[in-house]
Amino acid sequence: MEVTDVRLRRVNTEGRMKAIASITLDNEFVVHDIRVIDGNNGLFVAMPSKRTPDGEFRDIAHPINSATRGKIQEAILAEYHRLGKLEEELEEAGAS
């Protein structure tokens, strides 16, 4: 399984959520609403979830092993950092 596309929308809020992503797997399956979170130990991805009646959150879709989770997280965070650098370059170009 390969992550064949990552779409990312950065969010400018005061909270810990920094972006929302959608990924395409093997050009065949899309997962929306994956969140990029600024945690205590750095950035990580949180899979789409829904609140249960008792107030807990339950993942709607998630990888079943750590290797797959690593692939997904690596692809999303690479795109997050790429967009961050692009935004910096655009700001610098506009300032000069």
Swiss-Prot record:
The lineage of its organism: Bacteria, Bacillati, Bacillota, Bacilli, Bacillales. Keywords: Cell cycle, Cell division, Septation. Could be involved in septation. One of its GO terms (biological process) is division septum assembly. Belongs to the SpoVG family. This is Putative septation protein SpoVG. The keyword Cell division applies. Pfam families: SpoVG (PF04026).
